[in-house]
Amino acid sequence: MTTESMTTESITTELLSLPLDELLKRAAAVRDRRYGTRVTYSPKVFIPLTMLCQDKCGYCTFAQPPARLEAPYLTPEQVLDIARAGAAVGCHEALFTLGERPELRYRVAAQWLADHGYASTVEYLVAMCRLVRDEVGLLPHANAGALSRDELALLRPVSASQGMMLESLNADLDCHRGSPDKVPQRRLDTLEAAGELQIPFTTGILCGIGESRQDRVDALVAIAEAHRRWGHVQEVIVQNFLPKAGTAMHKSPPCPHDDYLEAIALARLILPEDIHLQVPPNLTDDFGELLNAGIDDWGGVSPVTADHVNPERPWPALERLTDVTEVAGHVLAPRLTIYPEFALDPERWLAEDMRFGVLDRSDAEGLGRDRDTATGDPSAEVWYSGADTEPPLVVEAPNVSATGALAELMRPATAAAGSAVRGAVAEVLDGVRMGQVPGEDEIVTLFGARGPEVRAVAALADELRREIVGDEVTWVSNRNINYTNVCTFKCRFCGFSKGPLSLNLRGNPYNLSLEEIAERVVEAKALGATEVCLQGGIHPKFDGDYYLAVTRIVHEAVPDMHIHGFTALEVTEGAKRNQEPLADYLRRMKEAGLKTLPGTAAEILDDEVRQVLCADKINTEEWLHAHRTAHEVGLRSNVTIMFGSIEHPRSWARHLLITRALQAETGGFTEFVPLPFVHMASPIYLQRASRRGPTFREVVLMHAIGRIVYRGAIDNVQASWVKLGLGGVRQLLRAGVNDLGGTLINENISRAAGAEHGQMATEADFRALVEPLGRRLVQRTTLYGRVDDAGHARIDTEASRNTGLNSALVAGA
């Protein structure tokens, strides 16, 4: 049964005739089909701008007369204090709730507004939304009631979303007598105008205030019809009436529980599926039961402010909300006041001045960023990629049985009692356990994992790691030599490249001489390095012969030094500037001493993303061609991905699959190296056009899902301690990672983007990281051979097999 073309009469006969159990079953099925296991909430602060109101609703304790208030309105300082308190503990939303048009009823309100230079309450609300957005960065949600089209338009540039409860379309309710703003047509006009203005809108119904079942259906049908016209209703709240002391309805019975469940289920079945369905968790004692009625959102939950509309009913603590949600087989995720469907289409749904604020607080799915603090204390310093802070605990030590059974790994000790991973994520993991390679949609599903689902993905990845490469953790002693930071390309993410017209983010442009490069190679050898990594900008004066000269000077300085250098961009440009085929050029580079290419310059192998990040750089096919050609001439390379800037999980999935396909063709990739975007000094972030890097949940998933997708293709997964810190890497070693990369003497590309971690790690640092986990640290060569105690590379046939190279390539190496 669908509701797209159902009339009110047919809805009444079809749905109201069903028993409650059947309604609940159908509603939950709709929710599961559309939203899976995910249930969202909005971390918010509640800002009661004014508690004066011209209406006299019989159930309301929010509205107060002037005599009971210290002042008619909160001052700007009070508004900022509330907003800052919320921002300090990770809130994303500033919910402005206020009485409707109090200046029309109370002279004191009109006088206060006039004294402060405002013509109306809405005008003052606009100013306070702008103040909070600009000074604190929270995203305003304006819940100002029945507004005119012009008033809604005034608020659109300073709010991420707006809202108004429709409540009921019954014009004869006693509770609304003396309340001019509750006239049904007035509220319908506001709902319609919000759609015309393309405002992400929240509305809802109030159950138990004297309305009939048919009244509820009529209101839900009206909301559904408005949404079908404009697509603007992002959520509908179904709220139950509870009597409150001091109100005209204090002796009225509360909304019967079964009536409330029925109303929620009806809403899910009547409304279009793309409208989210919300209930307030603080108004029902056993709120977990409401999940059975098809809801997918708990609404705003504040860690610092009361529910001023229902002050006698405090919000549940986040820990309890999480536990209740997970015990019911769902996972909890923070969101913004604007839902992902709207946040990911900012040109349509957001005024220009609101777009960066939403982007800055978004994760890759358009949901709210996790509060990434190490201790769980929401006021602690937040982790970002590159920041010198501990990440949150996402992957805890699994409850491993004596046999290491995956079934035990899938039930981590951190999960709430009685909870289990189910739904789409579990289905994909089941397929992986049966040997299937996940496809694009399935990989996107895994990247959407939350809570216990993340731990299940990590557990499976780590089991695969153990099967494929065992418990050794490898590292290579190497030195980075970045020979120039002058670059003709305009990659918008890069804080390393310099040019005469570019923003100078990290010192003056430089260009090392060949003699200086040779000296650094000799120094690296003296420090025990077995590899040098050569990378730099694309200098306008360099041609292909320059890269050949660098390779030769390095090889001559230390003949047994492994030369790992020159990205796909550098070799492509070198060949192009020399006007010779890439294969011929790479053969000459190999003859000069080059052994392997880094996978950098890949960024995201999705040309739609590359057009924004690096429009003048090589495209996806050119990157693949460079590495395919390198493999064909006997050079090896690795796969990197830079994630967390502007792209979304589908681009990640495409990147993984397209590189897996090339590996199946050539066998030339030795490892997968995820590189989290470091935002602090990146031009695109400073231009207010990117996110602030991945969340740590996304970091864990990238490494774990990489391990899963590349099973049987690329055996080694490396974590970048430079971008993540050793504390971040520690958790990744329980999520499929088996390699720490290099000691990276003189690593300065990440630092140019704002990373705070040091430029060198030591073997002792790595050992302190690995051994407490019961793993064994082993020094390797670039190609995953082993290094003996004297620092000499030795052939390790098992390690050679683990590189994933095909036999023909090994023979031609």
Model-derived features with residue positions:
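Hydrophobic faces of well-ordered beta-strands that scaffold small-molecule active sites
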Residues: V39-V45, A94-F96, P140-A142, Q162-M164, ...
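Conserved, mostly hydrophobic/aromatic
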Residues: A27, C57, F96, M164, ...
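Short, small-residue-rich loop/turn micro-motifs
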Residues: C53, T61, L98-E100, L166-S168, ...
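Conserved Radical SAM active-site core
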Residues: Q64-R228, A415, A420, K498-R654, ...
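N-terminal [4Fe-4S]-dependent radical SAM core
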Residues: I11-G58, F62-Y73, E77-Q78, I82, ...
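Mobile, glycine- and charge-enriched loop segments
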Residues: V39, P43, C53, Y59-A67, ...
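Conserved short loop/turn motifs at secondary-structure junctions
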Residues: E14-L15, P43-P48, P140-A144, C207-G210, ...
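Auxiliary Fe-S-binding modules of radical SAM enzymes
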Residues: M1-K25, A29-G36, L80, A87, ...
